[in-house]
Amino acid sequence: MIITPQELQKWLDDGKSFTVVDIRPEDHQKEFPLTGVNHVIATDDSIPITKNESVLICQFGIVTEGVIIEQNLENTFSLLGGAQAWNEFQSEKEDLSRWSRQTVLPEIGLNGQKRLLRSTVAIVGMGGLGCPAVQSLTAAGVGKLKIIDGDTVELSNLHRQPLFGHEDVGQLKVHVAKEKLEKTNEIAVIEATEEYLNKDNGLDFIRDADVIIDATDNIKTRQLIDKISKTSGIPMIYGGLYRYEGHVAILNSNGRPGYSDLFPEPLSGGNACADAGVLGMLPGIIGNIQALESVKLIVGIEPNLIGKLLIYDGMNHSTQLINL
């Protein structure tokens, strides 16, 4: 069973009778002492048996979950996020425990998670790339997501756009997406614009964004995103699909080239990537790579795809990385 720092604090405030057991190694206890709660110290093989509930605490809340399962402990809770999340909650009154599986990563940590919570990502298109990208970013804790698309859900979308179901056919994509994303993360701000991106609304749409995700299948719109990205100085994360192949690159960042620099002339062979057809799994992969690169940009993780083009071959599961 799991308990969050906020829930544990409520137990304390309500005067509930329970025992907190710190099973961390001695060096962790000394370096990161628990604050704001009385506790006993034990090892994972000498946990005291009590009549009331017990709350086990390790550094990140992972070890204690395993201990409870392995020892079949009853009336025992694992503190989600462990001592790290508890001490952060005590000092900042901000419960970050729901993201404990990513804050345990040293490249993310609590500071990286705070950057995500205070960030804004603009996503152009709620199709095969936009759906998985926005789902992952909402779950990861991005504070504000701005989505734009004037399209409605069609039956042919459902195999590659996992935000939508049969009951959503005929409804505006951004309205359905907003409703479902707010259920995924109730504290995220989802701003939905029920229009296609154009030269009149573009700059206003990306205003205050840290990153722009190009999740379109339309060359003209992609060129417009590139222009807006250059004008505003906001990096553009390009994603493209062709049959079993997918592309991702971070453009217009740190003086690196943009889409129009790479493709100064319109591409031949059709205006929409969708003309070639696609299996639903591939946009899921590419859209999630776009989301991953967004997180890396916001948090400041390297290496990333700034000035690089990643080519993924889904047929052979091979990749190429080209310097731009």
Pin down the residues of each PLM region.
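Adenine nucleotide-associated cytosolic modules
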Residues: 1-4, 10-13, 17-19, 23-53, ...
